[in-house]
Amino acid sequence: MSILRPSKEAILDDLRSFVLNEAEERTGFLATAVSKLNVVRRVQQGQKLSFNEPYLALILQGKKKTYIADKSFTYTAGDIVVTNLSLSSRTVVQEASFEKPFLSIVLTLDPLILSEVARRYGFDASEQADAPAMAVSQANSDFLLAFARMSRLLQEEQRGLPFDKFYYEELMLRLLASDLGRWACDLISPDSRVSKITKAVEILKKDFKESIRVGRLAEASNLSLSSFNRQFKTLTGTTPLQYQKQLRLYEADRLLRFEKRSVSQTAFNVGYSSLAQFSGDYKKFFGVLPSQVCPHAS
């Protein structure tokens, strides 16, 4: 006796309804009541700069193109996207409208849980991608159904029960078993290039306001200075000091937009000693002067 399975399009339709119900009229990157589970709804086309932690995303509707250094990645409905490193990227929403918004589900990747799932089910974490820190692939029906089960935690109000951990681990298992599994292994293998560079990234994220020697980052990554610089740029598209500057500017943007800090206060809070240098860097990165973002901040 055969058991009827829903079609991929039917599963995607259910997940679109879930995201629309969860987002209501809100737009942007939206956290849900389930840990690590987020939804995205965008109604306008255009470019956006963003800084993202490692994630697994399922695209439900619309089209995006992401640029990391000299590489680009295009994804649309039914695609799975994975990143295994904290990255700054330029993303262009190519298809989105109020009537038909861009929709996706985004899971934050937890290296500890991913590593435990890999160990429990015997995945060889030493199999590495040796490729950019982002990858795109088509989701199969099993992957889509795993996302559907995770989404029902909100629909059926099962929050707080062990189901959230169970369904999250199932998605990590699906990821490891997919053709994107090598990117996931890069995140958890201690000998992978991603894991080594991640040690430097963690220092940069923690001490981005301070002056940091590149030699210190290379030592933390257990790489020679030349190898470290080469591998860092291959993965992130920037030099370590450019990466640090981006961290400062993203934090400055947050302080200006959401905490309404003054430009001078913001500049010094993120590690700049020169207000003119800060204003110049901010405009070059975001396209506007910081004084235009929050002109009335005290």
List where the protein language model places each region.
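N-terminal positioning helix adjacent to the helix-turn-helix/winged-helix DNA-binding module
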Residues: A139-D142, Y167, S192-A200, T236, ...
